[in-house]
Amino acid sequence: MDLQAAGAQAQGAAEPSRGPPLPSARGAPPSPEAGFATADHSSQERETEKAMDRLARGTQSIPNDSPARGEGTHSEEEGFAMDEEDSDGELNTWELSEGTNCPPKEQPGDLFNEDWDSELKADQGNPYDADDIQESISQELKPWVCCAPQGDMIYDPSWHHPPPLIPYYSKMVFETGQFDDAED
């Protein structure tokens, strides 16, 4: 019988204990994994800075020889298992070697500077005149104008409503003598 159950019986409690006893109730010392706040973060910061430097130089992978945060590699902590064939030191096809350099980045001065005035002067031979531009602007403000049918139109509600899920078949009722003159 554990401590909680014995205490419940001694006090005459009608409610039995639920679940396993807490570690603090057993008097056991907390596990080392429980104390996250006491860890030294300076080694983590150095590893992070090294990794950022490698990435800035163009290296896409971090070598496996530097353990991250004490035991094991960073990839093992994240839940990725390293294959034994991949950890033989050879570069995979997607990894870059240390000597490979990235192409040089463009400097801000190399970027194209737009000069709108010169572009407007160059477009003087534009086939679209101000009337075309004004008409397109009016269609943007009223989008139904371009979709509206031209000419005499009869209202058709099927354009504005989805078709029914159950087809409706009207039963035609003929009056006697309605089509007598059609036979002649």
Curated annotation (Swiss-Prot):
One of its GO terms (molecular function) is histone binding. InterPro entries: COPR5. One of its GO terms (cellular component) is nucleus. The modification Phosphoserine is found at S66, S75. It comes from the Eukaryota. Residues 78-89 have a biased composition (Acidic residues). The keyword Nucleus applies. It holds the Pfam family COPR5. Residues 1-136 are annotated as: Disordered. Residues 1-14 have a biased composition (Low complexity). Residues 42-56 have a biased composition (Basic and acidic residues). The modification N-acetylmethionine is found at M1. It is found in: Nucleus. GO terms for biological process: chromatin remodeling; muscle organ development. Keywords: Acetylation, Chromatin regulator, Myogenesis, Nucleus, Phosphoprotein, Transcription, Transcription regulation. Interacts with PRMT5. Interacts with histone H4; specifically interacts with the N-terminus of histone H4 but not with histone H3. Interacts with CBFB. Found in a complex with PRMT5, RUNX1 and CBFB. Histone-binding protein required for histone H4 methyltransferase activity of PRMT5. Specifically required for histone H4 'Arg-3' methylation mediated by PRMT5, but not histone H3 'Arg-8' methylation, suggesting that it modulates the substrate specificity of PRMT5. Specifically interacts with the N-terminus of histone H4 but not with histone H3, suggesting that it acts by promoting the association between histone H4 and PRMT5. Involved in CCNE1 promoter repression. This is Coordinator of PRMT5 and differentiation stimulator. It comes from Homo sapiens.
